[in-house]
Amino acid sequence: GSVFNCGETCVLGTCYTPGCTCNTYRVCTKD
């Protein structure tokens, strides 16, 4: 959607917050 910072880092490439994905900056964002 609009990029929303989930407040979660994803060093291992996994986001635990529902609907969030790991971007190239290793930060979880929601679409």
From Swiss-Prot:
Highest taxon above the source species: Eukaryota
Disulfide bonds: 6-20, 10-22, 15-28
Post-translational modification: This peptide occurs in both cyclic and linear forms.
InterPro entries named among the record's database cross-references: Cyclotide, Cyclotide_moebius_CS, Cyclotide_sf
Keyword tags: Disulfide bond, Knottin, Plant defense
GO biological process, one term: defense response
SUPFAM superfamilies attached to this UniProt entry: Cyclotides (SSF57038)
Covalent cross-link Cyclopeptide (Gly-Asp) as placed by the record, residue numbers: 1-31
Entry similarity comment: Belongs to the cyclotide family. Bracelet subfamily.
Free-text comment on this protein's domains from its UniProt entry: The presence of a 'disulfide through disulfide knot' structurally defines this protein as a knottin.
Purpose of the protein: Probably participates in a plant defense mechanism.
Protein name (record): Kalata-B9
